[in-house]
Amino acid sequence: MNGVAKAPTLDDVATLAGVSPATVSRFLNSPEVVAAKTADRIRAAIVETGYLPNLTAGTLAGNRSRLIAALVPEIAQSIFNDTVEAMIEELSAAGNSVMLALTGADNTRLISQINAALSRRVDAIILTGVVTDEATRARLRAHPVTVIETWGLPEDPIDVAIGFSHRAAGEEMAHFLRARGYRRPHLVVPRSPRSERRASSFATRWMQEGGPEPTRMEVNVPSHFGQGRLSYRALADLPHLPDVVVCGSDWIAQGFIVEAQAAGMRVPDQIAVTGFGNLRMAGDMRPTITSVDVDGARVAREMIRVLRTLSAGETLSERRIDVGFRIIARESA
C-alpha cells in the first residue's frame, strides 16, 4: 500500500448502479436520453462512490465540452439577476458548467471575453444584449458554437436572440405617460445601447403625439442609487421643472425619489418618476415605483429550451424569440 486512495472509476459506478459502463457514459453526456429510473440509480451510485467524470477526456472524445459561457455587464444591483440565477440552476442541473464573466460597458472587454470563451471551446455563449462590432459577429458566426443574444431582439441575430424590443418599450412608456396627462418629461439615460434605444424611441413617440422634445441627462453604467440622487439635484440646471422623470433603471428611480422627498417634493403630486426592470424593491418603496417588467426567468427558460433542442440535433422553429414586456403602473407615476 502506498497510502494513496484509488479514485473511483466509471466502472465502479456502473457496477453499483447495475448497468453497463456505456450506459453511465451515455448518462454523463446526455442525461435526458437515459430512462428516469436508470438515471436515478446512476446518480445515487455517483454520490455513493464519489466519482468525478473526466471532463477533459469527454471533450476530446466527443464534440461537447458541457461548458457554457455567460457574459453579463454586471451582477451587482442588476436587472439581469433573475435570468442569471435561473440559467445557472437549470444548466447545472443538466450537467453543464457555467463560466460567468463580467463585461461592464466596455466593448473591448466584451470582445476579450468572447475570444476567451471561444478559446476554451465552449458549447454555447450567452450574451446579455446585442453584439454591435461586425468583426466580432463574423468571428462568432464562423465558429461551431451556439450563440444566444438575450435582453434584445436584433433583426439579424448571430444565431439565436431571446428578448424584447427596447424600441417598443420606450414607445409604450411615452404613450402610457401621455395618456396619464404628463406633459414635460425628463429622461435619465444610462450610457448603454439598450438604454439609449429606449430613450430615443421614447422621445420620438412623445413628439409624434404632440409633446415637446424631452430634456435628458446621461449617467454612467452600471446604474446605482447614488446616480438617482445626483439626477434630482441636476434638475436645477434645467430651464423648467419636468412633471415626470423617466429613469433608465429602478435603482436610479429609487435614488431620485429619496432625494426628491428629502428636498420636500411630493412624489407623484409635484413630480412623477418611472423606472425600468421591475426589481423587487420597486414594489417595496414608498411610493411604489411604476416600472417596466421583463420576465427574466422566462428568458432563462427559453434559453434552456433552445440549448436542449440544438443539443438534440433538432431544428429551431424560430431564431428570434420575443418574451415581451409590460408596464407595471404603481404610485410613483
Predicted features along the sequence, with ranges:
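Short acidic capping loops at alpha-helix termini that bridge into adjacent secondary structure
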Residues: 184, 213-216, 266-273
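Periplasmic-binding protein-like
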Residues: 121-129, 186-189, 218, 239-249, ...
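Hinge/beta->alpha junction and helix N-cap segments in small-molecule ligand-binding domains
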Residues: 55, 73-82, 101-109, 161-172, ...
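Flexible loop/hinge segments that line or gate small-molecule binding clefts
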Residues: 128-172, 251, 277-289
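Amphipathic helical "hinge" segments at domain boundaries
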Residues: 51-116, 120-124, 203
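Flexible loop/turn connectors
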Residues: 238-333
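Append "Primarily bacterial transcriptional regulators
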Residues: 13-14, 46, 192, 271, ...
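N-terminal helix-turn-helix DNA-binding module of bacterial transcription factors
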Residues: 1-65
